[in-house]
Amino acid sequence: PDHYDVSATGVGVVEADDLLGPDRVRPGDVVIAMGSSGLHSNGYSLARKVLLEIDRMSLAGHVEEFGRTLGEELLEPTRIYAKDCLALTAETQVRTFCHVTGGGLAGNLERVVPHGLVAELDRGTWTPAPVFTMIAQRGRIERAEMEKTFNMGIGMVAVVAPEDTDRALAILTARHLSCWTLGTVAKGKDGPRAKLV
């Protein structure tokens, strides 16, 4: 009686010729990152352990790095990218999308990159939001573990044809979405199909 479980399911229909996926990804394609609004829906157990249990921070306490309370930072609503993705598919050659959830950026991107290719992602193209830095520092969490647990500031990724890179970035920027070129797709061998370098 004191607990509620809220869930939702979305169902859609797509023409087979319009279906996006790994089979469309080619060497030379460009990986575009779309900024997250915060933790989104993953990593809260670790965030609570580090910030509330280990560091004993108050949810109501103002945090200088965030410019607001810890509670406000942790409760920032998840950005929904559906309209942004639809805008991209309407005007560019999108090969596929990747929603960055549990498993992190590389773990999720591997699902949409076919065998024989690798998405090479440049860590130097963005700075994770302060909440991720704080969790890592105060919890003494290794970078690899952070990158497997959290979105690290990237909530959605689009893989687009190289000639559409500038157009895709312009479309997302016009929609007031933080975005940037994260990397490219190259021929690969057996091993990870996405890697941060």
Where are these regions (language model features)?
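Glycine-/charge-enriched secondary-structure boundary and capping motifs
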Residues: 1-4, 58, 64-75, 79-197
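Glycine-rich anion-binding loops of enzyme active sites
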Residues: 1-45, 184
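Short alpha-helical scaffold segments that flank and stabilize functional sites
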Residues: 11, 46, 50, 168-171
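Basic, gly/Ser/Thr/Pro-rich low-complexity segments located predominantly at protein N termini
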Residues: 17, 26, 40-43, 48, ...
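Acidic, glycine-rich loop-and-beta core segments that form the ion-binding/anion-interacting portion
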Residues: 25-72
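N-terminal low-complexity, intrinsically disordered patches enriched in charged
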Residues: 21, 52, 111-112
